[in-house]
Amino acid sequence: MASPDFDVDAFLQQPLTARIATSGPTVRPVWFLWEEGAFWTLTGPWARLFDRVKDDPSVALVVDECDLVTGRVRQVIARGRAELVPFDVVRGRRKLVRYLGVDEALWDARFVHYLHDDPGERGTMWLRLVPASLTATDLSYSVAP
């Protein structure tokens, strides 16, 4: 990957929404965690994403922002083969806190269940994408006063 004009790790630490594409093509928005050089997102047998990745693990994922007020437009595009790996609560908590805040009492019950239900019974898994390619681009522009 060529060196982008912005800090990719800092960009990916923000609670942005990514979009992940599977064969078909099918694209869906996902919340993610960027850790250990990988994108982590929750899935399970209740989601079409789970079956699509089992059938064909080739995916593409984009995280971007477009701020019309400031002219900041940045994107990170990852491609590779996704893996379905066992869910762990500690990482799950980090991911959900990133989007919902630290106070679980304020969370919608469906998110609390990810942390307190048995992942084996529920079927909760991580989709982990270690990018085979990662492209970061800054397309920002100057805004006229």
Regions found by a protein language model. Name each.
Residues P45-W46, A60-E65, A105-Y114:
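Short acidic (Asp/Glu) patches
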Residues P15-P45, L61-E65:
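Short beta-strand segments
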Residues A2, R72-P145:
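Charged, gly/pro-rich active-site loop segments
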Residues Q14-L16, R28, E35, D55-V59, ...:
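A generic structural signal for short beta-strands and their flanking turns/coil linkers
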